[in-house]
Design a protein with these regions (language model features):
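C-terminal segment of classical bacterial N-terminal signal peptides
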Residues: 6-14
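Sec-dependent signal peptide recognition
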Residues: 1-3
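Subset of outer-membrane beta-barrel
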Residues: 16-302
Length: 302
């Protein structure tokens, strides 16, 4: 079904969106380059997302990122690799992130970030079952490369964080060849992310968060989440994607260095009622290379 929708859409202009994440609060560097190095040590994460499980050609996403501060000069560097697949289309992004941080107060930090990105696009039109022959869908696209740039700003202290970013600024056009060209345009995605950490008591922390994503040609996406952390070990939460899905989240801090997070989404649209749609699943592993010498003075919860 998704493959047929892709064929129908490709005749006109497609507004491509970035990958979707439910556990964005643990994967901020993927959408905001200014986050690179903000954890104060080398941090790496792996994420896998299977969306609309059971539907043929449904989206899947794999993400790897690694970032770290460099010395004591306020500079941070990061590397991200994102692989997206939907129907016959596969996209891979290779990102290099640079950030520079200034102190705004004793606890406050303001970071500015730049992203350099390379994009590889594969479209296997030969895998589609076409009812009618279409000349524009006869030749596969293999490893079509396009560069891009992005930018962001990120502020945080021990309790609060907020960021604004555009991971990909250039609007790349695809499928331009032929006498009657059709296009898929990679649009700018604007992100606003914010959150706070409240101590409800000595053992329970409340962590609300918000992500807003705006892209031309698509509905405004607003994700609101609420997580509760117990004894800085176990995390339980829920989220709502406006007019789209409800989510449940659970996380485990195996140690001060190692986090495991799981999420399940259920659509509230007609797609969620589809008999072959079992929902969306997401898992993230994050490891912080914290020095074993001494104690971590100010643990980060975002």
């Amino acid at each position: 079904m998704l493959a047929l929708l892709l064929v129908a859409s490709i005749q006109n202009t497609i507004a491509q969106q970035d990958s979707q994440y439910t556990q964005y609060m643990y994967n901020t560097v993927s959408v905001n380059p200014a986050y690179a190095g903000s954890r104060g040590h080398v941090s790496t994460a792996l994420l896998h997302r299977s969306q609309w499980v059971g539907l043929d050609g449904a989206p899947t996403t794999q993400t790897f990122n690694l970032h770290s501060p460099i010395g004591y000069r306020g500079v941070g560097l990061g590397l991200s690799i994102v692989n997206d697949k939907i129907g016959p289309t596969s996209e891979t992004y290779f990102d290099i992130d640079f950030s520079y941080t200034v102190y705004t107060s004793t606890e406050g930090r303001l970071s500015f970030g730049l992203k350099g990105s390379g994009h590889l696009l594969d479209v296997r039109f030969s895998e589609l079952n076409q009812y009618t022959s279409d000349a524009s869908l006869q030749n596969d696209i293999e490893n079509k490369f396009s560069p891009n740039i992005g930018a962001g700003v990120y502020y945080h202290n021990e309790r609060f964080y907020a960021g604004l970013s555009v991971p990909r600024i250039l609007q790349t056009l695809h499928f331009k060849d032929g006498p009657d060209p059709s296009t898929a345009k990679e649009q700018m995605n604007f992100y606003l992310i914010t959150g706070y950490v409240w101590d409800l008591n000595d053992n329970v922390k409340f962590k609300p968060a918000l992500l807003t994503k705006l892209v031309t040609g698509a509905p405004l996406q607003v994700d609101v989440s609420a997580n509760f952390m117990f004894s800085e070990k176990f995390i339980l939460g829920a989220a709502y994607r406006w007019d789209a899905a409800f989510s449940g989240m659970v996380g485990f801090n195996i140690s001060k260095k190692f986090l495991i997070g799981l999420a399940y989404d259920r659509e509230v649209t007609e797609l969620g009622a589809a008999i072959y749609n079992s929902g969306s699943f997401e898992a993230i592993l994050r490891y912080d290379f914290i020095s074993t010498k001494g104690n971590l003075k100010s643990p980060r919860f975002f």
